[in-house]
């Protein structure tokens, strides 16, 4: 293993391309990055670490290092990451804080931070048309959680449906049938929920809860020019959201600071572990705890939230977990937040110019040693279709 944090710049691989490369690739929760010729990528010990891409001067967390072909960085075997964009609603739902206290509606069914369909839990009326407007304060995103959701089902939701749009009337989703447990994220100044029923069959309706996901300044790193396999030693403090996880004193995995109290890592890193034996270091550069750069912050873990559908439907599907730190991190030199993936960012799949980076203290080659410092590598994204076969 390296003794310093390593970095590598990787091209993203499109869904189409990734599906061709791996039978266990799950396009609903995974994303690929790496080069066709191999030689660069993540390896043992990099699990849980970040795959970040730059967009308009900010860095966005696109993936959480999950798994790869054997040996590491083989030709046509890109690294596979949990897809943060597809899992963002789940992440936000787990770490939200401030409840929404007012909702404007013409159906008079809102009480504080919950919304129930008319008549709930009994059958909702026929021929209903209700519009609910949820104002979203500045610098927050709204998470709508479906505590219970049962509407008449149809493949296109033609009969009874709940449609969620933003303030620009952009459709975020249209829902019917059984959707209990779903979370929906709205990033705008208002969310509009339209509930429409027809004149025939009905069901018990829905019970929704609303909460805010407060955005902080994120994705800012120092202006620096730079073995994860084939990578380089990362400049000190150049990836301020990089977390180092230790279990019972031994290096375990990487992670990313997404809120002052929350680190996102891979579910397989912490599966079956107790929070009390996991320690998190932020602002670190060296693998060894004996070598410091002066920006380190040390934390206990008080809670682990593993994705409920980890390993479903395929091995390593939904491979994410949240670690709640014992106190908020102090955001200063060497420690900062990474932005969660944003749909505004057009992912640069299959670009010849490398555009995304992964970092960690994983082994420099298959069954090799770990570096002393944090490593980095630039990788291309691989399309889902090419990664799935």
Curated annotation (Swiss-Prot):
Keyword Disulfide bond set for record: yes
Keywords carried by this UniProt record: Disulfide bond, Repeat, Secreted
Membrane spanning stretches: none
Alphabetized InterPro entries for the sequence: CUB_dom, Peptidase_S1_PA, Peptidase_S1_PA_chymotrypsin, Peptidase_S1A, Sperma_CUB_dom_sf, Trypsin_dom, TRYPSIN_HIS
Primary location recorded for the protein, binned into one broad class: secreted
GO molecular function: serine-type endopeptidase activity
Matching SUPFAM superfamilies: Spermadhesin, CUB domain (SSF49854), Trypsin-like serine proteases (SSF50494)
Compartments (UniProt record): Secreted
GO cellular component: extracellular region
Residue intervals of the CUB domain: 103-213
Any one GO biological process: proteolysis
Domain Peptidase S1: 1-96, 228-389
Intrachain disulfide bonds: 18-32, 43-72, 157-176, 253-269
Entry annotated with the keyword Repeat: yes
Pfam families assigned: CUB, Trypsin
Tissue expression pattern: Component of the acid-insoluble organic matrix of the aragonitic skeleton (at protein level).
PROSITE patterns: CUB (PS01180), TRYPSIN_DOM (PS50240), TRYPSIN_HIS (PS00134), TRYPSIN_SER (PS00135)
PANTHER family: ACROSIN-RELATED, HYALIN
Annotated family: Belongs to the peptidase S1 family.
Name of the protein in question: CUB and peptidase domain-containing protein 2
């Amino acid at each position: 293993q390296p003794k310093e944090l390593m970095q590598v710049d990787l091209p993203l691989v499109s869904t189409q391309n990734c599906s061709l490369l791996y039978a266990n690739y799950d396009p609903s929760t995974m994303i690929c990055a790496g080069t066709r010729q191999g030689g660069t990528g993540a390896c043992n010990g990099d699990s849980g670490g970040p795959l970040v891409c730059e967009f308009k001067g900010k860095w966005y967390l696109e993936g959480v290092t999950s798994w790869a072909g054997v040996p590491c960085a083989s030709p046509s075997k890109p690294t596979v990451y949990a897809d943060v964009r597809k899992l963002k609603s789940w992440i936000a739902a787990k770490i939200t804080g401030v409840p929404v206290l007012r909702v404007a509606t013409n159906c008079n069914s809102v009480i504080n931070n919950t919304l129930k369909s008319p008549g709930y839990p009994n059958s909702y009326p026929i021929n209903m048309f209700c519009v609910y407007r949820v104002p979203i304060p500045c610098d927050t995103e709204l998470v709508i959680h479906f505590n219970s959701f049962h509407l008449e089902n149809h493949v296109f939701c033609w009969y009874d449906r709940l449609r969620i749009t933003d303030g620009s009337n952009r459709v975020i989703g249209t829902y019917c049938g059984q959707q209990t447990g779903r979370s929906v994220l709205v990033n705008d100044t208002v969310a509009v929920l339209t509930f429409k029923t027809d004149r025939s069959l009905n069901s018990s309706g829905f019970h929704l809860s609303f909460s805010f996901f407060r955005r902080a300044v994120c994705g800012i790193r120092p202006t620096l020019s730079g073995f994860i396999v084939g990578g380089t030693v990362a400049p000190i403090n150049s990836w301020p959201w990089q977390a180092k996880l230790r279990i019972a004193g031994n290096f375990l995995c990487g992670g990313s600071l997404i809120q002052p109290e929350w680190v996102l890592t891979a579910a397989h890193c912490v599966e079956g572990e107790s929070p009390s034996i996991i320690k998190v270091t932020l602002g670190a550069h060296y693998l060894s705890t004996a070598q410091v750069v002066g920006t380190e912050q040390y934390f206990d873990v008080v809670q682990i939230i593993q994705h409920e559908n980890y390993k479903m439907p395929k091995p390593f599907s939904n491979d994410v977990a949240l670690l709640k730190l014992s106190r908020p991190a102090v955001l200063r030199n060497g420690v900062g937040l990474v932005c969660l993936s944003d749909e505004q960012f057009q992912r640069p799949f299959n670009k010849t110019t490398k555009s995304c980076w992964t970092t960690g203290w994983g082994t420099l080659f298959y069954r090799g040693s770990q570096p002393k410092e944090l490593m980095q590598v630039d990788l291309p994204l691989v399309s889902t279709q090419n990664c799935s076969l």
